[in-house]
């Protein structure tokens, strides 16, 4: 087939025998990798039989795997996702990497699922295993396991980026789930933490749109009430880059007053640049701009408008 003209070959699927990295190796530069992500909320909603609010609630809990989007009952969705997580993802990772059992990597997935949007690294996770699991899983093994989870497209890693220093900070970092439904299934749908899940969804959406997404760190100096010069550090949830374009995005579930708005936008002020700055909130609101040019937009409005970053 490789010798025939006008013929494209698509090799699909990843399993314990053949991951996408193996496909690229086999074709030795003659092929391209296309990462097929779960459905975006816009895609999910286009086929959803219900209101926008109902669709988002479903999407947050059960994610965007196409098979799930076609299922009618919550029981069907939850059973399917739990089975996929246990009998497909975990089993394939164990088989692929010749692990002796699934216990350690399963426990690691549980810990990571409970801590989405939190800064972490292998050393911190090693300490968690010691204190919570009474286990001695070393940092180097944890780092290796995280690599396996990324290779299987279960997790995605967001590095920290020093905005003013223009450099990456290797550790700690954040890990997000490629699909929130799989994350929730791993925890048997017990921890539906809307604040963290919304952040995960925004991260995934930015990647769907083709952006490289980092966690922003802004360091600055500030004088205390006593006049002492101190160094401070604030975080921007996401720095989205694509070529010469950059956007700063904060995920804020609720902004009840001006004080909370100031807290969320303070990191924007410290960047000292003119890139677009956006705060996404859970409440359904049309885009609005303050006197500094910062935009507030509702999560559903943000997800359903492909041009929402440029409003």
What name fits each language-model region?
Residues 266-275:
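Arginine/glycine-rich "motif VI" loop of SF2 helicases in the C-terminal RecA-like domain
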Residues 16-18, 280-287:
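Short, polar loop motifs at secondary-structure junctions
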Residues 241-256, 264:
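Active-site ExK catalytic segment of metal-dependent nucleases
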Residues 283-311:
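Domain-level recognition of nuclease-like catalytic cores that cleave nucleotide substrates
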